[in-house]
Every structure is written in C-alpha cells, then in structure tokens.
C-alpha cells in the first residue's frame, strides 16, 4: 500500500466562552482521562483568578503562551557514526504545542501546599509566564542555551 496521500489536519473548534482556538487547544491538552468539562472548569477558574488581578485574562493567556514559545531547539543528527545536537528553528505549530505543554507541566509541578487546586497553580503559572518568569520560561531559556551551546554544529543542518 503506497503512502502518497497527505493526512488532513484536524481543526480544533474554538472554546465556548472566549471563542478562542488557542484556548480550546489548551483546554484539550490539560484534559485528563477524557474529562473535558472538568478541564474547562479549571482553566476558566484560573482565567477568572487572573481577571481578579484587574488584567484581561485572554491577553494574559495569549502573551504567556507567546512568551514561553521557543524559537530554537536542538535535534539529533547522525553524521559518520557520531550523533550531533544540531540547532534548528522551531516551526510555528510546534512552538505553540511546546509552549502549551510546558505551561501545563509547570502548573502541575507547583507545590500543593502553596496552591491547593490546579486552577490556582495554572493562574500563578500564567501570570509568571506573562511577566517572563516561572518554570515554563526557565525551560524555554534552557532550550535556547542548549541551542546556543551547539551553534558550532549548525552547518549540519540540511
């Protein structure tokens, strides 16, 4: 069987409250065990907490995702038996996916003593990312440092 056909990309429907596709992707990614309504409730609660700080929740969310999105990454490339970490630019869709994944992971890793619910953790992480701080921003900076350190191997890109 030949593999000539292109796979059609599935589009995500925008979320019901803010009518935003990026937020819908975020909700889907934060979902556990297929419980979307629980995920929606927690994300919207986190955005309400951001709103209580007299900030526009959608602007904070979008800025946080953009701030965390990496521009460069390293990819392994085998050349003559040796494997090199070759820095390359991150394409648009992968940037957003990594950003969403890191924000959710950073929120889940926050302390349960200080932040009792996932909504508390997520609100804190979104505000930190909005202000260019927090664990997700550290992860992005680590990736950029790694790409910078392996700049010597950038000629292996093809």
State what each model feature region is.
Residues 1-33, 37-40, 44-158:
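Strongly charged
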């Amino acid at each position: 069987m030949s593999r000539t056909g292109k796979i059609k990309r599935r589009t995500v429907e925008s979320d019901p409250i803010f009518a935003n596709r990026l937020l819908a992707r975020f909700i889907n990614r934060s979902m556990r065990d297929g419980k979307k309504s629980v995920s929606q409730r927690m994300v919207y609660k986190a955005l309400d907490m951001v709103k209580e700080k007299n900030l526009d929740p959608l602007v904070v969310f979008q800025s946080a995702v953009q701030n965390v999105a990496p521009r460069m990454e390293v990819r392994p490339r085998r050349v003559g038996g040796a494997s090199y970490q070759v820095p390359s630019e991150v394409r648009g869709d992968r940037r957003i996916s990594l950003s969403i994944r890191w924000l959710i992971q950073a929120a889940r890793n926050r302390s349960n003593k200080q932040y009792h619910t996932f909504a508390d953790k997520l609100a804190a992480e979104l505000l930190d990312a909005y202000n260019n701080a927090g664990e997700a921003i550290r992860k992005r900076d680590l990736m950029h440092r790694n790409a910078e350190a392996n700049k010597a191997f950038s000629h292996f890109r093809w």
